[in-house]
């Protein structure tokens, strides 16, 4: 219950703005698609794009700040995974608008 309240607060206002900003970029959406299949290191993600590693790092940082991905450092590598809880909360919020006249 407490976690649900915290996540709902995160999705309201600034957190929601960060979330939609992160989803607004095609590179970040592609990164999310990749992470939906398996966890990847920053280097593995960067290898899939024709852009600099600092640019990919910036995209990953925005996704992390929005709560869409989580990162774990293992030795000299940083591994990224989806934070599916935020996606669940976003879907729950969006479904409220599906048919507001029926309850």
Positions of predicted regions on the chain:
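Helix-turn-helix DNA-binding motif, specifically the short coil turn and the N-cap/start of the second
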Residues: 41, 52-55
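Pre-recognition alpha-helix immediately N-terminal to the DNA-recognition helix
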Residues: 29-31
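Short capping segments at the starts of secondary-structure elements
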Residues: 37-43
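Beta-hairpin "wing" of winged helix-turn-helix
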Residues: 64-74, 81
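Alpha-helical residues within the helix-turn-helix
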Residues: 47, 58, 64-65
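Amphipathic alpha-helical dimerization/coiled-coil segments
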Residues: 1-15, 84-103
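Residues within the alpha-helical elements of helix-turn-helix
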Residues: 34, 48
């Amino acid at each position: 219950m407490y976690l649900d309240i915290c996540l709902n607060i995160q999705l309201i206002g600034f957190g929601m703005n960060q979330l939609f900003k992160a989803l607004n970029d095609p590179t970040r959406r592609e990164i999310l698609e990749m992470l939906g299949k398996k966890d990847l290191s920053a280097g593995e993600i960067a290898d899939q794009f024709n852009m600099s590693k600092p640019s990919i790092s910036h995209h990953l940082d925005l996704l992390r700040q929005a709560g869409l991905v989580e990162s774990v450092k293992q030795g000299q590598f940083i591994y990224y995974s989806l934070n599916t809880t935020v996606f669940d909360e976003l879907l729950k919020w969006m479904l409220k608008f599906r048919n507001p006249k029926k309850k």
